[in-house]
UniProtKB/Swiss-Prot annotation:
Ligand binding (L-homocysteine): 432-434, 485, 600
Species: Actinobacillus pleuropneumoniae serotype 3 (strain JL03)
Keyword Methyltransferase: yes
Gene that this sequence comes from: metE
Residues annotated for 5-methyltetrahydropteroyltri-L-glutamate binding in this entry: 16-19, 112, 516-517, 562, 606
Classification lineage: Bacteria, Pseudomonadati, Pseudomonadota, Gammaproteobacteria, Pasteurellales
A biological process from GO: methionine biosynthetic process
InterPro entries in alphabetical order: Cbl-indep_Met_Synth_N, Cobalamin-indep_Met_synthase, Met_Synth_C/arc, UROD/MetE-like_sf
Stated role: Catalyzes the transfer of a methyl group from 5-methyltetrahydrofolate to homocysteine resulting in methionine formation.
Name by which UniProt lists this protein: 5-methyltetrahydropteroyltriglutamate--homocysteine methyltransferase
Binding site for L-methionine: 432-434, 485, 600
Length: 757
């Protein structure tokens, strides 16, 4: 018989129940016991869904109140010493303080979990870190599930991945040196799990899909030789990429089974066909929302079944944490877009797909002929749908002129033409894009969406806000203005709603971090722009002022990265389609007299593949898609872009290759350190380094901004330096926004006068 198991389940509930309960708890509106009871009910529901789908085990230990890597920091005693908490007796309040900070300590840093849109809390390791086992989190969930009558498989992230994902703090050392102390702690935790009578323990080592240094790889043999002494079978789970290059190492590890991601890396299967133990085949996509073609999946699984027999397990490619909970609640989508609805599968539907596969493998395809037929019909309909495939778009992409993604003239010539008409002072000041979104603005948008506010009233509300934003910027004497983006709820959703080829769910939420969930748009078909999206707002804003108004768009790579993307054509093609659609908007803005246009790309770096060898290909198509988004603009139109991340050094040639006339970046928190990289690289175009951190309501002093600007002037020629905040101001309040910008403008004017002498 084939074994079915799940690597992990979403934690937040079908309708984000956990999120709302957490937030009420933080506001002191919910008692701790009520939060614990709700969490227990969610776990029981998750286990029941797995059991009802004929899973041979329910997975435990995957549920968390905030983050599974934070749970592991508690379980190994590796919580940051700076908090002064004891990991053995940590209260729920203290747990949340680690994640969210308190009056004395800032929160543990957060970063992306591999190349997903989930964020984990980064372990802080010090030379003198001492570990201490605390298996309570896992043991309690095992007992709870067993009490409900389930067969249980706990999951824990492995020691090498855990250590790799952390950062060294304090005195310089190599965190790898902590491994020999960490492994006995893991052994202690696993022993406690085995003592609960579990047959299998799943240990996740996704770091194996990265370019790990040789000493880390070499350590796997010794680490797992020690852990294998535990009185339970170990399933080593890899995901997010191929581990074929480590096949010899993995086959030699003294574990009892291996999980492979055959969705992300189907080609790796050939390297493991002679694997002598349990092989868990990750065949249902744990990261996207499309139904699988089950006949095709069986074409892969049936030969494996013949070879492995009882040793074949089936599973999703990775944890289902990255997919929404249940498609069945999307009644609106089913009504408005029944065709698309039939092509989708959320977590519960993916579990049901695995159940069908298990039945087919155990009793033959005829036992599930109806389900397989339904799956095939949906796959065929999707392959041939004219809702998805539009000949004119394929034609447009195919017929792009040879240098479509190149400006007419080099930057040195363009900037002269731009400066001539812009006539800006030295160190021009501007904003990144958004201004504070008041409750009134949010209410007006929501009421308009629900049909409770007429179009005329909605437009009047937006225009009133735009005028307010323009007047405030004039009073502050900023040089290049923005319209403030009052009409936008989200920088990707706004454009997705106005582009063809996108759809939206109502409950398609996935966890980003803690209680924060995101609802990515669904890119299901060829992308076009039926009509202008931003032109009237920018044009209206420009009509209110003699100053220069900047148009604001989200770039193609960010739209791609923050969406669920169709899987029937390459991501690179989807990205180019978005770029070409945006170029129509850019040219319309230019025609409307908006000749400074910002195309935001905060997610270019996030899209980098896990392995360095794949970077160039990605950066090439991402760069091309970005340049296509402004194809055809005149030399005197100034293209800006904005990016916010802390690491540029390794991708600077690609950033320069975007050929934006001005790039604004987030630099205030790193004390302008980033700029040195731009200077060393001799970055050729204009730069606007952020001079204050918008993530804090704190108003910077004139001295702080002056210090940052003087540092910037040391490495960037004054003629090429812009002055701006780190990021958009959407989440700030008006009071601090005005005060922050006032300081920024005053300091700039002071330095301007000094430089003019």
């Amino acid at each position: 018989m084939t074994t079915l198991h799940i690597l992990g389940f979403p934690r937040v509930g079908a309708k984000r129940e956990l999120k709302f309960a957490q937030e009420r708890y933080w506001r002191k509106e919910l008692a701790e016991q009520d939060l614990l009871d709700l969490a227990k009910a969610l776990r029981e529901k998750n286990w029941l869904h797995q059991a009802q789908a004929d899973a041979d085990f329910v997975t435990v230990g995957d549920f968390t109140f905030y983050d599974h890597i934070l749970d592991l920091q508690v379980a190994t005693g590796a919580i940051p010493a700076r908090f002064g908490f004891d990991s053995q007796t940590l209260s729920l309040d203290q747990y949340f303080q680690l994640a969210r900070g308190n009056k004395e300590q800032f929160a543990i840093e957060m970063t992306k979990w591999f190349d997903t849109n989930y964020h984990y809390l980064v372990p802080e390791f010090q030379k003198n870190t001492t570990f201490k086992a605390n298996s309570t989190h896992y043991v309690n969930q095992i007992r709870e599930a067993k009490a409900a009558g389930h067969q249980v498989k706990p999951v824990i992230v492995g020691p090498l991945t855990f250590l790799w994902l952390g950062k060294e703090k304090g005195e310089a050392f190599n965190r790898f040196d902590l491994l020999k102390q960490l492994v006995p702690i893991y052994f202690e935790i696993l022993t406690a799990l085995a003592a609960e009578g579990v047959e299998w323990i799943q240990i996740d080592e996704p770091a194996l899909a990265l370019d790990l240094p040789q000493e880390w790889l070499a350590a796997y043999q010794d680490v797992y030789a020690q852990l294998a002494k535990v009185n339970a079978k170990l399933l080593l789970a890899t995901y997010f990429g191929s581990v074929a290059e480590h096949a010899a190492l993995l086959k030699a590890l003294p574990v009892d089974g291996l999980h492979l991601d055959l969705v992300r890396a189907p080609e790796q299967l050939s390297a493991f066909e002679d694997y002598p133990k349990v092989l868990s085949a990750g065949v249902i996509d744990g990261r996207n929302i499309w139904r699988a073609n089950l006949n095709r999946v069986l074409d892969v699984l049936e030969p494996l079944k013949a070879k492995f027999n009882q040793r074949l397990w089936i599973a999703p490619s990775c944890s289902l944490l990255h997919t929404p909970y249940d498609l069945a609640v999307e009644t609106q989508l089913q009504q408005n877009n029944p065709e698309l609805y039939r092509w989708l599968a959320f977590t519960l539907q993916k579990v049901a797909e695995l159940q069908v596969l298990k039945q087919a493998l155990n009793a033959g395809r005829s036992a599930v002929a109806e389900q397989l037929n339904d799956s095939q019909t949906a796959a065929d309909a999707r392959a041939n749908s004219n809702v998805i495939h539009k000949a004119e778009i394929a034609q447009r992409l195919a017929n792009l002129p040879a240098n479509a993604d190149k400006r007419q003239s080099p930057f040195a010539e363009r900037i002269k033409l731009q400066n001539k008409w812009l006539n800006l002072p030295l160190l021009p000041t501007t904003n990144i894009g958004s201004f504070p979104q008041t409750l009134e603005i949010r209410h007006a948008r929501a009421a308009f969406k629900k049909g409770e506010l007429s179009l005329a009233d909605y437009e009047a509300a937006m225009k009133k806000e735009i005028e307010f934003v323009v007047r405030k910027q004039e009073e502050l004497d900023l040089d290049v203005l923005v319209h403030g983006e009052a009409e936008r709820n989200d920088m990707v959703e706004y454009f997705g709603e106005l582009l063809d080829g996108f759809a939206f769910t109502k409950f398609g939420w996935v966890q980003s971090y803690g209680s924060r969930c995101v609802k990515p748009p669904v890119i299901y078909g060829d992308v076009t722009r039926p009509e202008p999206m931003t032109v009237r707002w920018s044009q209206y804003a420009q009509s209110l002022t003699d100053k220069v108004m900047k148009g604001m768009l989200t770039g193609p790579v960010t739209i791609l990265q923050w969406s669920f993307v169709r899987n029937d054509i390459p991501r690179s093609t989807v990205c180019k389609q978005i770029g070409v659609a945006l170029s129509d908007e850019v040219l319309d803005l230019e025609k409307a007299g908006i000749k400074v246009i910002q195309i935001d790309e905060p997610a270019i770096r996030e899209g980098l593949p896990l392995k360095r060898a794949d970077w160039d290909a990605y950066l090439q198509w991402a760069g091309e898609a970005f340049r296509l988004s402004y194809m055809g603009v005149k030399d005197d139109t100034q293209i800006h872009t904005h990016m916010c991340y802390s690491e540029f050094n390794d991708i600077l040639p690609a950033i320069a290759g975007l050929d934006a006339d001005v790039i604004t970046i987030e630099t205030s928190r790193s004390d302008m350190e980033l700029l040195t990289a731009f200077a060393d690289f001799k970055y050729p175009n204009d730069i606007g380094p952020g001079v204050y951190d918008i993530h804090s309501p704190r108003v910077p002093t004139a001295g702080e901004i002056e210090h940052l600007l003087r540092k910037a002037l040391k490495v960037i020629p004054k003629e090429r330096l812009w002055v701006n905040p780190d990021c958009g101001l959407k989440t700030r309040g008006w009071k601090e926004t005005i005060e922050q910008l006032q300081v920024m403008v005053e300091v700039t004017k002071k330095l301007r006068a000094e430089l003019a002498e």
